[in-house]
């Protein structure tokens, strides 16, 4: 393959994830995006728990029962001359660190906001994570077919709470029962909405020009007049789109529509392929790797168990950073310094696996893993380096875990360590006793862990509450001061699954006082894998 052909393949790639608060419509928008990418023929209504139409991106038994997407799957589809990789992230109240880590593997994010509710808690948290890498953000204001808040007010809230400038690309005409469509500010065109056509791609009627009398006929004179006045205000008060500011994560283009009604999603996709960056350079501990390099490099950002209920395999998800992956290729696993031949890598359309013949920078491939791959592992064609920026996040919820059958302590520890390497949960072993404490970012992680311990390790475990409210990884450059810190705080110290020392605090107040008392000790919220 010539360098110019390779450069073309890389330039076509767009890799993004969707971030939203639960029930803002993320799974629905995922389906509609796949519909436009012709990856599925009709959109099954999501959450139809009793029906056989489960959303394409929700799998694993627990998900099917609850109508939520726990596992982060990957879907690739063509759109507008590009190849788009969509990484699905759990959006339910109970999500996990996987969600955070997935955001480190994409070049761009789509933020979905319920226009009736505005900025919600989970959206804030996820936006904080995208800030770690200044990821570019597109915004989709959803549920315009319902009664919503004043769009200007919602934009102000996004700017104020998420500290990002908003640049409206489309603007709604009416909402709820009187939702008539959107006007595209860049194209000077109005797209008219028809309700009840959400399952397929609609033939949309377009009215060219803002002052076209056809617009008055289509939406009614009063609404048209009101809309033109509103638009004047919007254009005066909002930011012009600036591509550089978008790429640096300082400005977000905003699109309006309804994912359920399948309206406005294509405008967002057009913006994505036009403006979102092709695969970006990434830092390693020795240098920066650029996507156009010939040699293959990639890193593992997530490990998922039992994607195939018939086999107890685990799949490691790897983001290709540079070069081209080919079937049967020999790669160096940098952490273990071993060379491995990858003959059966996978690509994904949720739930349907197919074997990869080749993959390029920006693509996500799945590697079969029998316990030898860990999160954060770097694979190269021989070069010794490690990609940085794939973090562990300090858990926010803690439980003590206890066995029904005390003789299975060994299996429990083995299971927990493996699950922590996968990123399903974090394990802490206090230095002062034999407790096992598990830490998570979302409640559902605890359920997932106990059901997997039972099915994969044949261990029945029960949870008990524990007096821990937060944890931090600790380190100190002054050995003497660190020894004193360890001696005086032994009751609050624990080792995590990778034997890293951590401070487990009963309250935030306790943590703050301890930090003030030991200014030389560094307390970290995230830890590199």
Curated annotation (Swiss-Prot):
Binding site for GTP: 20-27, 88-92, 142-145
Any single Pfam family the record assigns to this protein: EF-G_D2
Coiled coil location: none
Cell compartment(s), UniProt: Cytoplasm
Molecular function GO terms recorded: GTP binding; GTPase activity; guanosine tetraphosphate binding; translation release factor activity, codon nonspecific; translation release factor activity, codon specific
Keyword Nucleotide-binding appears in the UniProt entry: yes
Biological process annotations from GO: regulation of translational termination; translational termination
Gene3D superfamilies per UniProt: P-loop containing nucleotide triphosphate hydrolases, Peptide chain release factor 3, domain III
CC per GO annotation: cytosol
Stored InterPro entries: EF-G-like_DII, EFG_III/V, G_TR_CS, P-loop_NTPase, PrfC, RF3_C, RF3_dom_3_sf, RF3_GTP-bd
Keywords from the named record: Cytoplasm, GTP-binding, Nucleotide-binding, Protein biosynthesis
Domain tr-type G: 11-280
Record HAMAP family: Rel_fac_3
Function: Increases the formation of ribosomal termination complexes and stimulates activities of RF-1 and RF-2. It binds guanine nucleotides and has strong preference for UGA stop codons. It may interact directly with the ribosome. The stimulation of RF-1 and RF-2 is significantly reduced by GTP and GDP, but not by GMP.
Family, similarity comment: Belongs to the TRAFAC class translation factor GTPase superfamily. Classic translation factor GTPase family. PrfC subfamily.
Protein name: Peptide chain release factor 3
Organism: Yersinia pestis
Gene that specifies this protein: prfC
């Amino acid at each position: 393959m010539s360098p110019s052909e390779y450069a073309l393949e890389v330039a076509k790639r767009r890799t993004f994830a969707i971030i939203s608060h639960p029930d803002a419509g993320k799974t629905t928008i995922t389906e509609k995006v796949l519909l436009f990418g012709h990856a599925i023929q009709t959109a099954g209504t999501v959450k139809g728990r009793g029906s056989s139409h489960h959303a394409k991106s929700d799998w694993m038994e627990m998900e099917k029962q609850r109508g939520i997407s726990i596992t982060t799957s990957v879907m690739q589809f063509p759109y507008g001359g590009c190849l788009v990789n969509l990484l699905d992230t759990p959006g339910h109240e109970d999500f996990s660190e996987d969600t955070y880590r997935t955001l480190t593997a994409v070049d761009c994010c789509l933020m979905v906001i319920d226009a009736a509710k505005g900025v919600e808690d989970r959206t804030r948290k996820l936006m904080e994570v995208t800030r770690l890498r200044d990821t570019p953000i597109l915004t989709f204001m959803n549920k315009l077919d319902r009664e919503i808040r004043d769009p200007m007010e919602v934009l102000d809230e996004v700017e104020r709470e998420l500290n990002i400038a908003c640049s409206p690309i489309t603007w709604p005409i009416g909402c709820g029962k009187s939702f008539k469509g959107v006007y595209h500010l860049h194209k000077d065109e109005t797209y008219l909405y028809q309700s009840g056509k959400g399952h397929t791609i609609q033939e949309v009627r377009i009215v060219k020009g803002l002052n076209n009398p056809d617009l008055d006929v289509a939406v009614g004179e009063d609404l048209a007049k009101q809309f033109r006045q509103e638009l004047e205000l919007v254009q005066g008060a909002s930011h012009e789109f600036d591509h550089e500011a978008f790429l640096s994560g300082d400005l977000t283009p905003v699109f309006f529509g309804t994912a359920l009604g399948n309206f406005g999603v294509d405008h967002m996709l057009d913006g994505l392929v036009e403006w979102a960056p092709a695969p970006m350079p990434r830092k390693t501990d020795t240098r920066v790797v650029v996507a156009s390099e010939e040699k293959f490099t990639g890193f593992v950002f997530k490990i998922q168990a039992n994607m195939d209920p018939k086999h107890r395999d685990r799949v490691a998800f790897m983001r290709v950073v540079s070069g081209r992956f080919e079937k049967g290729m020999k790669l160096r696993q940098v952490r273990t310094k071993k060379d491995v031949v990858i003959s059966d890598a996978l690509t994904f359309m949720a739930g349907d696996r197919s074997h990869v013949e080749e993959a390029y920078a920006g693509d996500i491939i799945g590697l079969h893993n029998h316990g030898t791959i860990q999160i954060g592992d770097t694979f190269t064609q021989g070069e010794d380096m490690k990609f940085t920026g794939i973090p562990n996040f300090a858990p926010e919820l803690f439980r003590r875990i206890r066995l029904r059958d005390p003789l299975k302590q060994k299996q429990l520890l083995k299971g927990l360590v493996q699950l922590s390497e996968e990123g399903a949960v974090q394990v802490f072993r206090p230095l002062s006793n034999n407790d096992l404490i598990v830490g998570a970012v979302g409640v559902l992680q605890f359920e997932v862990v106990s059901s997997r311990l039972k099915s994969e390790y044949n261990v029945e475990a029960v949870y008990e509450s524990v007096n821990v409210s937060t944890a931090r990884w600790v380190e100190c450059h002054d050995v003497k001061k660190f020894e004193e810190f360890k001696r005086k705080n032994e009751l609050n110290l624990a080792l995590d699954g990778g034997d890293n020392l951590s401070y487990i605090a009963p309250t935030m107040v306790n943590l703050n006082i301890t930090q003030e008392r030991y200014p030389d000790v560094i307390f970290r919220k995230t830890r590199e894998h």
